[in-house]
Amino acid sequence: MLPYKKKENGLIIDCFKENTTWNMIYDLYVFDRKLRLLVFDAIERLEIAIRTQIIYQLSHKYGSHWQDNPNIFKAPERRVLRDGSIVTFDVYAEIQKHISEQLRSNRAEVFIQHYRNKYDTPVNPPSWMSVEVMYFSHLSRICTGLKNRADISGIANYFSLPPQIFCSWIHSINYIRNLCAHHARLWNREMSIVPEKLHFSKILTWISNPDTVQRGKIYYFFCMLDYLLQTANPTSSFKERLKTLLDEYKNVVSLPAMGFSEGWENEKMWK
């Protein structure tokens, strides 16, 4: 409802602008809900490709149970948070804990139950089973937690991205995914996690002038998603569905508030 609230001295006050109607507020709510569903669907398709590449690349190099090898991951790292508390980031321990929980679960996937009932060793299932039951957040942590840069390069190269940018983008996508999953407002949000900038691409279609785009707004995320889907799901209808949704609610939403740059529709990637 904030877009329809008045401002005084630059501050939003608890009073609606003139001529604001309930239908206007409701239409904005419906638009945001449809946008979340569209984005969540696209992320699911991307998630399959990321999961597949992690399994494929690391299994070829380290074998079927690479997830059980602590030597391929960075050492545990202690970090001081904004509130002064200290936490330890340990990717290997985190994924091992999750796999163990899945093995013990009474609601485990059928293929996990099969492995548990038939095999005693290795204790954990092979990576194509273990990674299948991981959350998107685990995939993001694996990418950032690999010790050898060459390991993440193999995954990032599939998506035509430098490793550092790929890890940043996947981290941002996980953040957006959580917003969608928890029904949070999406359309005009100022993102608390800002992805790194991709300046250009020689292989895939990208923004002609990234410097003009606000990376803390949802439009940049749309561009990221479309870029990744060019490889992950070339037949994806994401951009067509997005443009249709924007056109349907063109009298409801402000494109500048979403970070859309002037002339965005003329960009090659949105043709």
Where are these regions (language model features)?
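Long, contiguous internal "core" modules enriched in hydrophobic/ aromatic residues
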Residues: 1-271
